[in-house]
Design a protein with these regions (language model features):
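A cross-family "folded-core" feature that marks the main globular domain of proteins
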Residues: 1-52
Length: 52
């Protein structure tokens, strides 16, 4: 059984990679922890924006 974030990573690898970079930025600049689930949701939002 695949985890939600694994499914998103497989379906949208470019968006998932981008969201991981954003997570690194948020964590380094603001000291806020971003979960894997939040990274996956961010990837979905990035995919939606790219489709517009």
């Amino acid at each position: 059984n695949l985890e939600f974030q694994e499914v998103i990573d497989r379906l949208y690898p470019k968006e998932y990679e981008c969201s991981q970079k954003i997570r690194e930025l948020i964590q380094s600049q603001y000291g806020h922890t971003v979960t894997e689930e939040e990274v996956a949701y961010l990837a979905l939002h990035i995919k939606r924006i790219r489709m517009e």
